[in-house]
C-alpha cells in the first residue's frame, strides 16, 4: 500500500512537471516505476514521454533502455526494436524483462520457435512463470 502511494506521488509529480513545462530530478528507479505505471494503463504516449525524459537523466540505465524496448514493441517499430536489442544483448541476456521483449519481438514477427527459446531462457530468471507459460501457449 505504501509503495503504491509512493508510486502515485511520483506519477503526480511527473505529470505536474510536464504540465508546467519544468524539469524535476527523479532517480532511475522512480522513472522506471512511472514508466511501468503508464505501460500498465496502456498510455503509450505518456510512457514514451517518461522514457525519453528518463534517458536524458540516466542515459546508461539498462532498465530504462529495456522499458524503451517495451514501448517500441507496443508501437510496432521493429527496426528500432532490433537495433536496441542488439545494443542491449550483451548486458541484458540474464534479465527477464529483456528476454520477454525478445520473445515478443520474434512472436510478433511470426517466428514462434525463436520466441519460445527466449521464453525458456526467461523462465530461468523470472518469477512470472505463469505469464511465460501462457505466453508460450
Per-range role (PLM):
Residues 37-38, 72, 106:
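Residue at a conserved register position within TPR or TPR-like alpha-solenoid repeats
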